[in-house]
């Protein structure tokens, strides 16, 4: 089709250029400051196998986008550099000439395999769009770009014969819309298209009870049942464009803000179970998306608890039968322990370390492979979700603390355990109780307490209280319980890291009696910690007390009670509660745990959204299921 220059095209291109530097900061997948040398051997850049390696092809595309951003930056030495402009222009033609015309169906171009579709359906259209716009006053790439988008993005949800949804469609739709602008359509005409409407309905981000999108507790899901924030983070840079094209209310930015607040930090750190299938716990762009304020944040239905304060960031994920505890793909299958068992805090003043996807991290239980490598491959040609065979989780939060209690069985990891985590002002206490291997083991198990990067820090020589980037690990024994083993240090020379671990006997693991616990504390206040953990005799009750007893967490699973003396708050939850709107808390279930705290049911002061009958309390809340009282 002949390219028609209509006003909406010019208006969008101006907006794109005016905001490119800001939106590029928000882009997660990128080459931030492109410096790679152009080549004259037909591969675009030196030392690149552009036409035979999917990895190299992706790097080339991101480098071209990065160079386009530098070309647009008035403060960059390459601003409107003519040699660079010609290199970008030539690169677009080289790519186009190497591609099959029309696009292949259910296969990838250049002899690459289907899992490499992402480069051709998402990154390549973005690259052509970006280069076409930044060079518009130097070289005319409009017809070339329109033609490529015609073949590789015939619809915002269809590329190379494959339909895409959710996060992928959010990315694909923007260059598709640009292609329509090149063809002379207006913003309004494009917005009326059926498949564009599908994407716009997605990015309205209405709260949903299940499936893709932002749930009522503000957790983001993709692939139906996966807490896959990588898709939301990767798509965020497109939201301002959609609001410009189709109106400022197109994307519900408040719901997006609440969703990101649930999981992120200003340092860019995220629990690895929430971000990416490569096991990463870091996204450099997070600080460019929103300001992450301090507080205790909980996603009660999606089982996410996050704490940010002036000392640390902490985040833990729990499990539920309808939520994937792990998702694998053909290229990523070693991160199940990271997703399922990471229990730690990160110092606000510590260095951000390059992350290793090996399963060695605070909270991970090592059973069959003590080196942390457990391969749980996908069961099909694409991604596969894995669910717990049993899972009950309850969250409880006050102004100063947050707790999570869970019972879970993970068949692929050969584990069943109870997990109790408490965040407080100084750090985190964690206990695994009733740990059981589903299949017999002969070697002792280990729980990773702390990991030390030996690239930048001296190696540990003892295993008492251990410090690694500004975090102190503290050993605890449980009152009325057999003493627990001291920490043991291991060094992994090939990985250049050390671990502090607690050993659990194989005999205990095989019969379901495994126990391990520890605290991770901000280094500067570790000496202030006075956390205790007590088993109440002749019962299943556990009491965790900390901060000079001002924070007390009592667990009589499935019930968890969190008491905050400073704020006079008391929060109660039941892990067996599966309701999503009207929640019931049986009085019989909480009488004993309240008595441990020298309280009774009559001590509880009810807020407006909680009512009481003879046998139960009732809470009306679409966004959470915690019963929050004063006393």
UniProtKB/Swiss-Prot annotation:
Its main location: virion. It holds the Pfam family Lyase_8_N. InterPro entries: Baculo_ODV-E66_core (IPR043082), Chondroitin_lyas (IPR008929), Lyase_8_alpha_N (IPR012970), ODV-E66_C_baculovirus (IPR006934). The keyword NADP does not apply. It comes from the Viruses. One of its GO terms (cellular component) is viral envelope. Gene3D superfamilies: Baculovirus E66 occlusion-derived virus envelope protein, domain 2, Chondroitin AC/alginate lyase. Keywords: Membrane, Viral envelope protein, Virion. The keyword Chloroplast does not apply. It is found in: Virion membrane. Component of the polyhedra envelope. Belongs to the baculoviridae E66 family. This is Occlusion-derived virus envelope protein E66. It comes from Leucania separata nucleopolyhedrovirus (LsNPV). The lineage of its organism: Viruses, Viruses incertae sedis, Naldaviricetes, Lefavirales, Baculoviridae.
């Amino acid at each position: 089709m002949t390219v028609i220059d209509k006003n909406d095209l010019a208006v969008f291109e101006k907006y794109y250029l005016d905001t490119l530097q800001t939106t590029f900061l928000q882009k997660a997948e990128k080459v931030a400051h492109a410096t790679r040398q152009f080549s004259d051997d037909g591969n675009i850049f030196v030392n690149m196998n552009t036409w035979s390696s999917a990895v190299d092809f992706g790097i080339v595309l991101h480098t071209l986008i990065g160079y386009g951003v530098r070309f647009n930056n008035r403060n960059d030495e390459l601003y409107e550099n003519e040699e660079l402009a010609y290199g970008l222009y030539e690169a677009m033609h080289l790519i186009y000439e190497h591609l099959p015309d029309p696009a292949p169906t259910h296969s990838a171009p250049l002899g690459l395999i289907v899992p490499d579709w992402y480069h051709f359906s998402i990154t390549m259209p973005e690259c052509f769009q970006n280069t076409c716009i930044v060079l518009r006053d130097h070289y005319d790439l409009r017809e070339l770009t329109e033609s490529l988008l015609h073949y590789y993005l015939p619809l915002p949800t269809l590329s190379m014969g494959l339909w895409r949804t959710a996060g992928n469609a959010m990315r694909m739709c923007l260059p598709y819309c640009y292609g329509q602008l090149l063809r002379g359509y207006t913003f309004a005409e494009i917005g009326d298209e059926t498949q564009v409407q599908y994407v716009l309905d997605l990015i309205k981000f209405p709260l949903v009870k299940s499936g893709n999108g932002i749930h009522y507790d503000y957790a983001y899901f993709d692939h139906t049942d996966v807490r896959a924030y990588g898709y939301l983070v990767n798509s965020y840079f497109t939201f301002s464009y959609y609001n410009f094209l189709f109106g400022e209310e197109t994307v519900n930015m408040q719901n997006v803000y609440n969703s990101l607040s649930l999981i992120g930090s200003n340092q860019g750190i995220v629990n690895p179970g929430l971000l990416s299938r490569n096991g990463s716990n870091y996204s450099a762009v997070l600080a460019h998306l929103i300001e992450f304020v301090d507080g205790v944040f909980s996603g009660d239905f999606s089982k996410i608890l996050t704490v940010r304060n002036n000392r640390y960031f902490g985040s833990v994920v729990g499990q539920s039968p309808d939520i994937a505890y792990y998702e694998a793909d053909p290229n990523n299958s070693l991160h199940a322990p990271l997703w399922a068992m990471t229990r730690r805090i990160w110092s606000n003043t510590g260095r951000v370390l390059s992350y290793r996807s090996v399963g060695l991290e605070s909270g991970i239980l090592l059973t069959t492979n003590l080196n942390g490598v457990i391969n749980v491959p996908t069961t099909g040609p694409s991604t596969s979700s894995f669910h717990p065979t049993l899972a009950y989780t309850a969250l409880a939060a006050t102004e100063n603390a947050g707790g999570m209690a869970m019972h879970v069985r993970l068949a692929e990891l050969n584990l069943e355990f109870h997990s109790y985590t408490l965040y407080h002002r100084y750090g985190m206490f964690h206990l695994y109780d009733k740990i059981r291997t589903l299949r017999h083991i002969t070697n002792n198990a280990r729980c990773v307490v702390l990991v030390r990067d030996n690239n930048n820090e001296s190696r540990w020589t003892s295993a008492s209280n251990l410090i690694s980037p500004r975090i102190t690990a503290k050993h605890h024994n449980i009152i009325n319980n057999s003493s627990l083993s001291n920490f043991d240090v291991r060094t992994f020379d090939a990985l250049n890291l050390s671990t502090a671990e607690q050993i659990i006997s194989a005999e205990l693991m095989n019969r379901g009696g495994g126990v391990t616990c520890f605290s991770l504390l901000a280094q500067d206040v570790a000496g202030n910690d006075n956390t205790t953990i007590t088993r109440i005799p002749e019962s299943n009750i556990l009491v965790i007390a900390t901060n000079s007893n001002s924070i007390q967490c009592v667990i009589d699973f499935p019930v968890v009670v969190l008491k905050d003396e400073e704020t006079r708050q008391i929060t109660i939850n039941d892990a067996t509660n599966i309701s999503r709107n009207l929640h019931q808390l049986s009085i019989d279930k909480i009488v004993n745990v309240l008595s441990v705290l020298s309280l009774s049911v009559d001590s509880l002061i009810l807020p407006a959204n909680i009512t009481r009958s003879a046998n139960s309390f009732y809470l009306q809340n679409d966004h959470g299921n915690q019963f929050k009282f004063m006393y």
